[in-house]
Amino acid sequence: MARVRTNTKLKPSKKADLQVVKPVKTTRYSDIDLNNWRAYDHVKTDTLWEFPTRLKEGGHSNEYHGNYIPQIAQQLYERFTKKNDVVLDLFFGSGTSGIEAINMGRRCIGVELKDELAESVSQKFTPKQLVTDVRIICADSASEEMREKVQASLDIMRE
């Protein structure tokens, strides 16, 4: 079960006059206010996520067979990460997870088995992002070598 912390900042409800003001309540892994979660219109809260179209802006394209729609990453990152957190994608592919991480103020470590795909996806990021916010590791996701490279990348990103 996730531990919950309560911020001391108070956030008024929609009817601020004479209404009870609840403290902002978040978890250690998300900035979503648990006392006000229904007010997040951009976060899908039902069990079926329907998106009218696939996002194509912000660096996304549909050139790789193993990709998924960026809105899935958006929904997951909104719920389970905070700004500046590091997202680990062990099957980086076309970089959808990394692009969305950057677009949402997160950082990303992507592991990709194919050299040519890792090189191609690195072109989607700026040289500065590849130093500070995105690490692309070419390795087998099940290997000890990958674990060591991910740990080294995490150490660098924490500095």
Task: Report the location of each language-model feature.
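Class I S-adenosyl-L-methionine-dependent methyltransferase catalytic core
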Residues: 2-159
